[in-house]
Amino acid sequence: MAKIINVIGREIMDSRGNPTVEAEVHLEGGFIGMAAAPSGASTGSREALELRDGDKSRYLGKGVLTAVANVNGPIRAALIGKDATAQAELDQIMIDLDGTENKDKLGANAILAVSLAAAKAAAAFKGMPLYAHIAELNGTPGQYAMPVPMMNILNGGEHADNNVDIQEFMVQPVGAKNFREALRMGAEIFHTLKKVLHGKGLSTSVGDEGGFAPNLSSNADALAVIKEAVELAGYKLGTDVTLALDCAASEFYKDGKYDLSGEGKVFDSNGFSDFLKSLTEQYPIVSIEDGLDESDWDGWAYQTKIMGDKIQLVGDDLFVTNTKILTRGIENGIANSILIKFNQIGSLTETLAAIRMAKAAGYTAVISHRSGETEDSTIADLAVGTAAGQIKTGSLCRSDRVAKYNQLLRIEEQLGEKAPYRGLKEIKGQA
């Protein structure tokens, strides 16, 4: 038995200079797992609660000492002596101990850090890589895939201080033969984009996720400069590289309207979906995330009707990695893909359940980082171990983003042909 003998929590820093929770789980025999909870900027209202201290005299109220104390106190006491390989049991113990719908007693950041640390300790005990242990927990042992990266090379919205409304403009190197080649293509496009922006006298400073954040006059201008960079880097848009958007539309949804202040345009729900559809007709955009507000379910039904057969429509704030909300979406034919973020739901077991539910319903699952990250690269193993097929982990700079790409390189080196890179086939509506 992989007996837990100690659980340790501590306050560490994330990529935005804010505190977050790191946990260690120690087993008999000297096996240790360590993991850290990420943190989001544009968050869905139904996400599990990230517990912050609120003490303005420390870290402007963003300290996590209460969550850390929950790890070192009640969570530790409940897990000592338990089997780290029994992931579902451990997670349920913590969920029951918390006793709230959104984990606001112990904090999703406390529970998640321990949940992931336990999985890492169990993998070490079993003498296998984390992705292999995750595949076993998922009921899909030995079934792997390298994910197509959605590389966020140009930022707007909540991730940048500029006048672009859409939050993320991403490239997907779908024409690559393997992940290693996909990463190289993305890096070359990223560096070429820097030259293009510099040549136009635009800012080349980067946002939270490592993408550039220039002051462009419209969202269409953002797509145009990316097109220029892709072609200048020697790639064909639509064949070698496709585009993806994260609108984070809840951030500019006001009084039932979509207010694109950067463009000076206001749309009603159907009008904004029509606007997005027009962009997909001008550029090879194959995936749109949070194209409407999380509460605009009628609008989502219309968007799915007009684009769902050919464009991947990803619910992030819409579904918040929650099986209850995803069930409603599936039953009503809303969207066709779910973004998977550990900390929206707060445990590994619940995350795996959301991925399985999505796949069973014919939805795709896109594994994602948060804008506030650490060097923790667990999502790379999650993407491969569940054969999810797609990952969002930022741009090609900032070590908090690159850590995930580097882990994927290591995994591909280990697995070789056992983890195929399927390119466009992984994206809903493109197979």
UniProtKB/Swiss-Prot annotation:
Active site: 209 (proton donor), 341 (proton acceptor)
Record GO cellular component, one term: cell surface
Record's subcellular location: Cytoplasm; Secreted; Cell surface
Family matches, as SUPFAM superfamilies: Enolase C-terminal domain-like, Enolase N-terminal domain-like
Protein's GO biological process: glycolytic process
UniProt-listed PROSITE patterns: ENOLASE
Cofactor note: Binds a second Mg(2+) ion via substrate during catalysis.
Pathway assignment: Carbohydrate degradation; glycolysis; pyruvate from D-glyceraldehyde 3-phosphate: step 4/5
Pfam families per UniProt: Enolase_C, Enolase_N
Membrane-crossing residue ranges in chain numbering: none
Binding-site residues, Mg(2+): 246, 289, 316
Enzyme Commission number, as recorded: 4.2.1.11
Family that this chain belongs to: Belongs to the enolase family.
Protein name: Enolase
UniProt gene name: eno
